[in-house]
C-alpha cells in the first residue's frame, strides 16, 4: 500500500515539473511549435531509461521497489507517459523484436492521434453543441 502513496507523490511532482517546464520553454521559444512537450518527452524517456538500467534485475545497484516505482511510474508517469512507451519500444528492439517494436511505434502514434482527435471533437461538441468539428 505504501508503494501507491510513493507513486501518487511522484505523479504529483512529475505533473508539476511538466507544467513548469512546458511554460518555461514556451516563454523562450513561443507557443507555435510544441518544443516544451518534445523536450519533456525526451527528458522523461532519458530518466526512465537511466532508472531502468540502473535498477533493473541485471543491475548491481540495489534500488528498492518503492523507489523504483516512485521514479519510473510516479515521476516519469506524471511528467510524461511517453517515457514508458519509449522504454517498452527499446526493450522490444533490444530483444530483436523488430516487428513488435515498429508496431508499438505505429500503433501508439496513430491510435493516440485518433484518440486525441476524437476527444477534441467530443469536447468541442460538449462545450458548444452547435459546433461539430
Language-model segments: what does each one mean?
Residues 1-133:
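Membrane-interface helix-loop junctions in multi-pass transporters/channels
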